[in-house]
């Protein structure tokens, strides 16, 4: 079933900034456009936003719309997961392009861990995600999809997002 992801997920950008440097990064462009932080390559944590988790109505929160989970400071992760435990009514989504850079485990069942795959050479990220992050649920984002991904082992993957690159970049 096709669903517009913007209709079912609220962005909660607790951390803004990313060290990966993707040429097609919409987050970096938005940060520059709206002057959110001084240096996008140096992630910053905004703990005041944790209060957004106190909403009673269950929601789906994407916590990595402007960052990569693998490069979060461990102290930030501890604060965030503590607040998540206090607010189990929500689902929390985390996304990374570098699952090899993190080893993480949580007992929380309302945490969803995803990996971005944009080409066939990145398919191994899915297995790396399962090996390096334990807990909750898994998903894969094939977005933007630059080539034919081919056959993929989706064992344990509960959700798939497929999309194209947006914006005006030449050659996309």
Q: Where on the chain are the PLM-derived regions?
A:
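Conserved Radical SAM active-site core
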Residues: 1-112, 120-130, 134, 151-154
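Structural motif
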Residues: 62-63, 114, 141, 161
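Conserved C-terminal portion of the radical SAM core fold
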Residues: 124-171
